[in-house]
């Protein structure tokens, strides 16, 4: 079996008219500006953000290319503090309050403007 040792890249696609809203959402969620962005045309624009040891890219897509929503899990040291910060931030849609699962993971969820769910969690194991 091959071991994967590189960084993880998450690519989220949106139509051009939603691009700036999605880019701004991830800028607020991650608390950083993109480390790389471009805007060559309606089908060639994007923004890349660092997320732990990986990247999250928000990319434009052609109208005829549809992708479904995804779930992204991002670990944070303090779920409750992150929840308070994002509740106070503009443009963040909270879809669930912090809860602790029976197996010890605490999380809450937000939804980006394109319908993707982001679980912000902390696990003790």
What does each of the following model-derived ranges do?
Residues 12-14, 38, 98, 122:
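A cross-domain feature marking catalytic cores of carbohydrate-active enzymes
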Residues 1-23, 70-72, 124:
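N-terminal beta-strand motif that seeds the catalytic metal site of vicinal oxygen chelate
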Residues 16-20, 72-117:
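Vicinal oxygen chelate
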Residues 25-28, 85:
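Alpha-helical scaffold elements within enzyme catalytic domains, especially in hydrolases
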């Amino acid at each position: 079996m091959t071991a994967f040792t590189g960084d993880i890249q998450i690519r989220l696609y949106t139509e051009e008219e939603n691009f700036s809203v999605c880019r701004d959402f991830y800028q607020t969620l991650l608390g950083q500006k993109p480390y790389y962005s471009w805007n060559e045309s309606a089908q060639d624009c994007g923004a890349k953000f660092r997320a732990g040891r990986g990247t999250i890219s928000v990319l434009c897509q052609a109208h005829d290319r549809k992708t479904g929503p995804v779930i992204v899990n991002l670990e944070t040291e303090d779920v409750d503090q992150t929840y308070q910060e994002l509740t106070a931030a503009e443009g963040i849609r909270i879809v669930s309050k912090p809860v602790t699962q029976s197996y010890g993971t605490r999380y809450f969820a937000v939804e980006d403007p394109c319908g993707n769910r982001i679980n912000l969690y902390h696990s003790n194991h």
